Amino acid sequence: MKRVQHYLLDEQVPAPFYKRSQVADRCNGLLVEFREGFALEFRLYDDGMAYRFLSRTDDEVTLRGERAPFLFPEGSTAVVPYVRDTPQQHEGLPFGEQFMQSFENTYTETSLSAMDSTRLAFLPLLVRTPGGERVCITDADLESYPGMFLRRAAADRLEGVFAPCPRRIVAGGYDRMQGVVEEYEPYIARIAARQTLPWRAMALVRNDAELAQTDLVWRLASPCRLDDISWIEPGKAAWEWWNGWGLYGVDFEAGINQRTYEYYIDFAAANGLRYVVMDDGWSAGHHRPFETAGDIDLPALVAYGAERGVGLILWIGYLPFAGQMEELCAHYSKMGIRGFKVDFMDRDDQLLTDFVYEAARTAARYGLLLDLHGIYKPTGVQRTYPNVINFEGVHGLEQVKWSPVEVDQVTYDVTMPFIRMMAGPVDYTQGAMRNAVRENFRPVNGEPMSQGTRCRQLAQYVVFDAPLSMLCDAPSQYEREEECLRFIAGVPTVWDQTRVLEGEVGHCIVTARRSGEVWYVGGMTGWKARTVHLDLSFLPEGTYDVELFRDGANARRIARDYRREVLTLDASEGLDVELAPGGGFAARIVKH
């Protein structure tokens, strides 16, 4: 050991495009310098701790591995997002077949000692100790380094596992848009001179509600590297893929064509939506991204949208984008496109995390947003490059289109905000107007439905963090549901203040958020009906008008049943709201 340095941080940091406008960054820090050419840094916060290694050499270093053990008391339990089965095989490489996957799965609750030691878990992962502590483990500031998986190494111990650096990558997967690793190097990373490694971050709290409102990952991320962020506009988007371009009652054939996209633009403009996402199908082919399909005239659509205050975001596969990133960004930025939704990355090795930062930098130079799908969890790039506006890495609403009927999306909805969302925002793509109770749910790709009630879908716009948020259903569906549409379209996507009023992992969550002088509250339950007491004492003193959407009297049988009420209440009062099984509620609160 060469030197030990203690330090304190205590500052309020502006947080644009986030769940609060200011983040309190207060911690005790410890930096330990070693003679062997590296340092180890610790930070201790009120709601967590983190550590990271720092290279102190002036040379590149090859790392063959990293030890990251996490030891827990006997009797601890875990809420685990296992990787899904994958077809890749790599003889002699433990877990090699599990490194390529989409980071989308439901959670498995288990005792730590019974966790499947043959399967990796992706992060974040939650452990509960017998003493009542909650420990949520994730990465932060993951740049030019592989992401961490966890495996059970002993009855009471988890250990980090890291994908080796790819040696040979070939085009494969869906229409050859994915980079499939056929051969790995015998090391996990090449570290540049004086590079800082990612933080190993652990939220440490005593109740579930604190998990859903921690700022730990955002605090640990590198500060913004863009001089000008005034061009970055969060907001909502009309989106066609989930609903299958499902317009009806119109005088043209709906599909991937000019008339359909003009209709989506008109719908977005009429309802104050900032964007239309043009998903898979707009181009002449996945590997022909400079050409459009059918009669689509993209410059004309850009102009049509610009006249109405609506921007366009284009979907594109990972390899077609990575192979000609500069040319695509230059071409479509000049045309007036506002961003790309990049899909099918499905890895988090060093080369892929390098790609994410290169894409963020390149897109920012051309004034373009990025919405990353088929991607690992957020680790802070959204602070460093805030044009990276949202992430998938979530078992989102698209899953109900094809998952087995037994899939439990409702329980996932009240688990994910405490675990996955502690890492950052989620492009869950909510907003279904076809809703089903448990016994009526079926996966239907062409005309999909959600699990749970209509009000649950409304609540998700308040509960889920999403600076770019989709309206997943067809305009024709929303136009029949004017009250719900008006509420959804009006919910902000970034906030001045966020408070989780009530929460229990896997059972319920109630979140209050403020934008300016207006408050929104959203609540959801699992499959168990419950009564939520909405205590309004979080509001400043005074009288308030409350617009409330609550499950209807028959929502237990007919999930789309809801009631809208307008109430006048004092901040000293409370309100009991009954939630049906799989139910929810949403409220808008303004000063009377």
Label every model-predicted segment:
Residues 188, 192-267, 271:
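An acidic-aromatic substrate-binding cleft motif
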Residues 369-374, 399-401, 467-478, 495-499, ...:
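Acidic/polar loop patches that form or flank catalytic/metal-binding clefts of enzymes
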Residues 504-541, 545, 585-586:
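Carbohydrate-binding surface patches
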Residues 53, 268, 343, 370, ...:
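Conserved, mostly hydrophobic/aromatic
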Residues 473-520, 524, 556-560:
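Glycan-recognition and catalytic regions of carbohydrate-active enzymes
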Residues 566-592:
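C-terminal beta-strand-rich structural cap/linker in extracellular carbohydrate-active enzymes
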Residues 1-219:
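N-terminal accessory beta-strand-rich subdomains and adjacent acidic, glycine-rich linkers
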Residues 278-453:
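Aromatic- and carboxylate-enriched substrate-binding clefts and catalytic-loop regions
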